[in-house]
Amino acid sequence: SGGKKIKVDKPLGLGGGLTVDIDA
């Protein structure tokens, strides 16, 4: 991949973690 990983804790207060792996 070689992209960047974005770690977001409780996005928009959904009560959960979100890990987005962008292949840029």
Curated annotation (Swiss-Prot):
Annotated GO biological process: photosynthesis
Its primary localisation, in coarse terms, equals: plastid
Which terms in the GO cellular component ontology are assigned?
Answer: chloroplast thylakoid membrane; photosystem II
Query: Where, subcellularly, is it found?
Result: Plastid, Chloroplast thylakoid membrane
> What keywords appear on the UniProt entry?
Chloroplast, Membrane, Photosynthesis, Photosystem II, Plastid, Thylakoid
* Highest taxon of source: Eukaryota
Nuclease listed as a keyword: no
Mark the transmembrane ranges: none
What does it do? Answer: Associated with the oxygen-evolving complex of photosystem II.
Family as reported in the entry's similarity comment? Belongs to the psbR family.
Kindly provide the name given to this protein in its UniProt entry.
Photosystem II 10 kDa polypeptide
What gene codes for this chain? PSBR
